[in-house]
Amino acid sequence: MGGKHVAVLLGGFSSERPVSLSSGNACALALEGEGYKVTRVDVGRDVAAVLDELRPDVAFNALHGPFGEDGTIQGILEYLAIPYTHSGVLASALAMDKAQAKKVAAAAGIPVAGERVMNRFDFTSEHPLQPPYVVKPVREGSSFGVVIVKEDQSHPPQILTSSEWPFGNQVMVERYIHGRELTCGVLDGEALGVTEVVPLGHNFYDYDAKYAAGGSKHVIPAGISPKIYQKIQTLAVMAHQAIGCRGVSRSDFRYDDRFSEDGEVIWLEVNTQPGMTPTSLVPEMAAHAGRSFGDLVSWMVEDASCLR
């Protein structure tokens, strides 16, 4: 497997730069351990010129957030004819737009929460939905900008119309789903397993719960019935296929089992660029399934292509 020259794309200039640096450096170290020649490329606005001069055999995309997972870098790599990992242009752009991704998922028969897309400046003193509900930037990851509006809040939060809001004007408002945080990775069209994410000291799986030390506990395999476990794996594969993902993806779910074991399973979103440190969710699932981190990233390099 080794011998190829791999450019690991990391860093970038989105709000998820710190996450990308962690993912990229972890992947670079693992690939070096597998015998690949690795060049770390901290992505800037001149990335096309840098890659055109470097001409690697493969670009390992360890970017997160806008530019890295919205089809932009994928389009640059297609233009340069450099094979790359993860999903292609269309799937990346579609998955990054939460509202459009939900429409595609719903059309494929995947259960989603009711929602509406609106301009944040259209928020008035009246709630757009009956609380509780969740407000999400349409095109952000890592739970940046997510606001939960609770039952006892009489007005929408003021931050949404503040000049300090950095996440764009389009937001998605969806009903709040009570329940447990479950997530399922998909590799090469097959489910890797289901993990329950238990936030520690947080109301939901926000940025700090995801990335701060001790912010959450990962339970794998999730302590749910075999029926629900299989259902979530099936839905994750369906989402992977419906969106058109390639390589690896991760779908997030809410499972409300307060009233019955069957409960309600709701698909939240698919992540085409999931975190890639050894302790991130997808590598943990792969390890539980018997695939080492080095083997996982090597597989991704060998799977790389253009026209994904």
Curated annotation (Swiss-Prot):
<dbReference type="GO" id="GO:0071555">
    <property type="term" value="P:cell wall organization"/>
</dbReference>
<protein>
    <recommendedName>
        <fullName>D-alanine--D-alanine ligase</fullName>
        <ecNumber>6.3.2.4</ecNumber>
    </recommendedName>
</protein>
<dbReference type="InterPro" id="IPR005905">
    <property type="entry name" value="D_ala_D_ala"/>
</dbReference>
<feature type="binding site">
    <location>
        <position position="252"/>
    </location>
    <ligand>
        <name>Mg(2+) 1</name>
    </ligand>
</feature>
<keyword id="KW-0436">Ligase</keyword>
<dbReference type="InterPro" id="IPR011127">
    <property type="entry name" value="Dala_Dala_lig_N"/>
</dbReference>
<keyword id="KW-0460">Magnesium</keyword>
<dbReference type="InterPro" id="IPR011761">
    <property type="entry name" value="ATP-grasp"/>
</dbReference>
<feature type="binding site">
    <location>
        <begin position="128"/>
        <end position="183"/>
    </location>
    <ligand>
        <name>ATP</name>
    </ligand>
</feature>
<keyword id="KW-0961">Cell wall biogenesis/degradation</keyword>
<feature type="binding site">
    <location>
        <position position="269"/>
    </location>
    <ligand>
        <name>Mg(2+) 2</name>
    </ligand>
</feature>
<feature type="binding site">
    <location>
        <position position="269"/>
    </location>
    <ligand>
        <name>Mg(2+) 1</name>
    </ligand>
</feature>
<dbReference type="Pfam" id="PF07478">
    <property type="entry name" value="Dala_Dala_lig_C"/>
</dbReference>
<dbReference type="InterPro" id="IPR013815">
    <property type="entry name" value="ATP_grasp_subdomain_1"/>
</dbReference>
<comment type="function">
    <text>Cell wall formation.</text>
</comment>
<keyword id="KW-0067">ATP-binding</keyword>
<dbReference type="InterPro" id="IPR000291">
    <property type="entry name" value="D-Ala_lig_Van_CS"/>
</dbReference>
<dbReference type="GO" id="GO:0046872">
    <property type="term" value="F:metal ion binding"/>
</dbReference>
<keyword id="KW-0479">Metal-binding</keyword>
<dbReference type="GO" id="GO:0005524">
    <property type="term" value="F:ATP binding"/>
</dbReference>
<dbReference type="GO" id="GO:0005737">
    <property type="term" value="C:cytoplasm"/>
</dbReference>
<keyword id="KW-0133">Cell shape</keyword>
<keyword id="KW-0963">Cytoplasm</keyword>
<dbReference type="GO" id="GO:0008360">
    <property type="term" value="P:regulation of cell shape"/>
</dbReference>
<keyword id="KW-0573">Peptidoglycan synthesis</keyword>
<feature type="binding site">
    <location>
        <position position="271"/>
    </location>
    <ligand>
        <name>Mg(2+) 2</name>
    </ligand>
</feature>
<keyword id="KW-0547">Nucleotide-binding</keyword>
<comment type="pathway">
    <text>Cell wall biogenesis; peptidoglycan biosynthesis.</text>
</comment>
<feature type="domain" description="ATP-grasp">
    <location>
        <begin position="102"/>
        <end position="302"/>
    </location>
</feature>
<dbReference type="InterPro" id="IPR016185">
    <property type="entry name" value="PreATP-grasp_dom_sf"/>
</dbReference>
<dbReference type="Pfam" id="PF01820">
    <property type="entry name" value="Dala_Dala_lig_N"/>
</dbReference>
<dbReference type="GO" id="GO:0009252">
    <property type="term" value="P:peptidoglycan biosynthetic process"/>
</dbReference>
<keyword id="KW-0464">Manganese</keyword>
<dbReference type="GO" id="GO:0008716">
    <property type="term" value="F:D-alanine-D-alanine ligase activity"/>
</dbReference>
<dbReference type="InterPro" id="IPR011095">
    <property type="entry name" value="Dala_Dala_lig_C"/>
</dbReference>
<comment type="similarity">
    <text>Belongs to the D-alanine--D-alanine ligase family.</text>
</comment>
